[in-house]
């Protein structure tokens, strides 16, 4: 069973939803790693300040700060599109699938239930999964991956 199939099974995603979720993991991981660049710049700034070579490299640090800001902006934009927009596309698919399943249930079932309560419960659950897939799941996996990558890279520095 591939990772994509595991995601489809675990989170009840469509095939495209699983692909989008993997893309969200990757983009959030890259965004987290790019957020570490200013820390590296600060380390180099303090190191050069302590060595007394900061004046010669001022333009280099200004350019580095500008590049960091641009990279953070670009990766955050990509992460936003990968996590939030794709989540709501998948949510539409999930709502349609739910409606198709409800269509197949006999009408006598709905006569025994309070329709307002049933609708509120189901749509509340869908809204909760939307929030989970847009806010928590990609960032959780990305934080694990990026933390491991950053920890390993610190051993080599």
Pin down the residues of each PLM region:
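Hydrophobic alpha-helical interface/terminus motif in multipass membrane transporters
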Residues: 42-46, 82-86, 98, 102, ...
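Membrane-interfacial segments
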Residues: 46-54, 87, 91, 106, ...
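Hydrophobic alpha-helical transmembrane segments of ABC transporter permease domains
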Residues: 26, 30-38, 43, 126-157
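Residue-level hotspots within the lipid-embedded alpha helices of multi-pass solute transporters
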Residues: 31-36, 69-73, 85-89, 105, ...
